[in-house]
């Protein structure tokens, strides 16, 4: 059976991956031409994209390191 720590680790990795994908998408949308329809839709949309852009900037490197370390750990546990 799977213990609670493994389940919690899997959930945390999944949440981190989803947050990284959303933040990465926000960075891509934010880097588009300011005259595009994406950034001109509404102030609320632009503010949300900006917040996710900052989250993406702050978690990109630590998130990548954590995901890689967890992957290596899972490979070592199989042996």
Curated annotation (Swiss-Prot):
Induction: Expressed in the intermediate phase of the viral replicative cycle. InterPro entries: Poxvirus_I5 (IPR006803). Residues 2-8, 69-79 are intravirion. The chain crosses the membrane at residues 9-29, 48-68. It holds the Pfam family Pox_I5. Residues 30-47 are virion surface. It is a multi-pass membrane protein. The keyword Transmembrane applies. Coiled coil: none annotated. Belongs to the orthopoxvirus OPG081 family. This is Protein OPG081. It comes from Monkeypox virus. The lineage of its organism: Viruses, Varidnaviria, Bamfordvirae, Nucleocytoviricota, Pokkesviricetes.
């Amino acid at each position: 059976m799977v213990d609670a720590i493994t389940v919690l680790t899997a959930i945390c990795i999944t949440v981190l991956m989803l947050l990284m994908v959303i933040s990465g998408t926000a960075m891509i949308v934010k880097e588009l031409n300011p005259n595009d329809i994406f950034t001109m839709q509404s102030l609320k949309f632009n503010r949300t994209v900006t917040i996710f852009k900052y989250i993406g900037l702050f978690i990109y490197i630590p998130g990548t390191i954590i995901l890689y370390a967890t992957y290596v750990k899972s490979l070592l546990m199989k042996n």
